[in-house]
Amino acid sequence: VDAVVIATPDHWHAAIAIAACKAGKDVYLEKPLTFTVYEGQRLIEAVRANHIVFQTGSMQRSMSVFRHAAEVCRSGKLGKIKFIRAWAGDGPKPFTLETSAAPAGLDWERWVGPLPAEWLNKYNHTLNPLLDEKGKDECWGAWRWYQGLGGGFTTDWGAHMFAIAQ
């Protein structure tokens, strides 16, 4: 194995990416890279110390319509750009869901992974990584909208919008 693609739930990103770097593997990491500045600094250190090829996954930044818009802005056709505003919706909401036992077949402890131990007792069917908000098996995780598990729209869509604004 020469490289890894990391497209796990957000709270796993930093731990897996840093471990991959330390193992000498090149890394493609989906957004958001990390939850905290501290995690980001540790990731940068791991990439540099191990001479890793590292790429951030941000599909919108690579889309032709956004690349064209950036080229127009950089070309000077619009004059000197003095200000850019990017908005991506609300941040995460507090976890106030009623908790229950995780269903058979879902290794909740493994899914929680690097999160604080309190999350081991916070399962709710809404968080099931195999179910969407309507209970369909479409692997769309509502977990991303709750503090501690995801960053709400800020990290889910903000990562795209802020990258494009750059």
Regions found by a protein language model. Give the residues of each.
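N-terminal Rossmann-like NAD(P) cofactor-binding module of classical short-chain dehydrogenase/reductase
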Residues: D2-V5
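Beta-strand-loop-alpha-helix segment that lines the small-molecule cofactor/substrate pocket
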Residues: P9-D10, A14-S62, G76
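Predominantly a Rossmann-like dinucleotide-binding segment in NAD(P)-dependent oxidoreductases
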Residues: I52-T56, Q60-Q166
